[in-house]
Curated annotation (Swiss-Prot):
This is Uncharacterized methyltransferase MTH_231. Its EC number is 2.1.1.-. The keyword ATP-binding does not apply. It is an enzyme of class 2 (transferase). Gene3D superfamilies: Isopropylmalate Dehydrogenase. Belongs to the MtxX family. GO terms for biological process: methylation. NCBIfam families: methan_mark_4. InterPro entries: MeTrfase_MtxX_xsu (IPR016764). It comes from the Archaea. It comes from Methanothermobacter thermautotrophicus (strain ATCC 29096 / DSM 1053 / JCM 10044 / NBRC 100330 / Delta H). GO terms for molecular function: methyltransferase activity. The keyword Transferase applies.
């Protein structure tokens, strides 16, 4: 199991061609260990730390190392106003079946529980219940949303919000499950890249630890958000497991 050594909280972050991570680390009010190559980062994964932020290092070899422990899915932590939530699936090839989305919902919920947060799941589908009959695609999406909700309800607090994602956010859901990865990716881009929502990076679900994935072209401000998010997760994770 990956973790911190000797009880010290170590946050490891990668620095590639984009040096903004160095600026972000200097602004953090906690210690950040910077590494400057994929090889160093992978060695840190094997060594153990409280949390990892990929930063501006290339993804391929690092993700391959993470996947040695089993399949991974990503969930993006987004803040809209005072409300924060994990949005998944966000990879365009993820969450294609109800079973896939159930596994993602469970992984995201268990991840939050390890940080001391109680999951509240919002399931999103392609229409309101009154839209049944408008098209086969809408019908399928709504029925899948209902079925997924029935699968989750014995494990976590959950509600099927149909297409009303704004209500899921307003109600304080901290796990939001999109109808598929393409839709999740579009929701992310609409909220963060077009709108004013803030992204703190994507956590790797299925990794036995805390790994926050970030863009290689992120600003120093964006990397600082990711570092603070990783630190917040690590503190909750450690307190919950003491």
């Amino acid at each position: 199991m990956y973790g911190s050594e000797g009880g010290a909280m170590r946050i490891v972050a990668g620095v590639g061609e984009n040096r903004n991570m160095e600026r972000a680390a200097s602004l953090a009010d906690f210690e950040v260990d910077l590494v400057h190559s994929e090889e160093e980062f992978i060695e840190e994964l094997r060594r153990g730390a409280a949390a990892y932020v990929r930063g501006s290092l290339p993804a391929a070899n690092i993700m391959a190392e993470l996947k040695k422990g089993g399949p991974l899915n990503r969930a993006s932590w987004i803040e809209v106003g005072a409300n924060g939530f994990l949005l998944a699936p966000v990879g365009i090839d993820e969450g294609r079946t109800v079973d896939d989305r159930f596994k993602i919902a469970v992984s995201a919920s268990e991840f939050l529980r390890k940080t001391g947060e109680e999951p509240r799941v919002g399931v999103i589908s392609g229409g309101r219940r009154g839209d049944l009959g408008r098209s086969p695609e809408v019908d399928r999406s709504i029925h899948e949303g209902e079925f997924l909700t029935s699968m989750i309800k014995d494990k976590y607090r959950v509600r099927h919000y149909h297409i009303l994602i704004e209500e899921a956010v307003a109600d304080g859901c901290n796990v939001i499950i999109a109808p598929d990865g393409i839709t999740g990716n579009l929701i992310f881009r609409s909220l963060v890249l077009v709108g004013t929502a803030r992204s703190y990076g994507a956590v790797a679900l299925g990794f036995d630890g805390i790994f926050v994935d970030t863009s290689r072209s992120q600003t120093a401000e964006g990397y600082l958000r990711a570092l603070k998010f990783a630190h917040w997760l690590a503190r909750g994770w450690n307190e919950d497991n003491e």
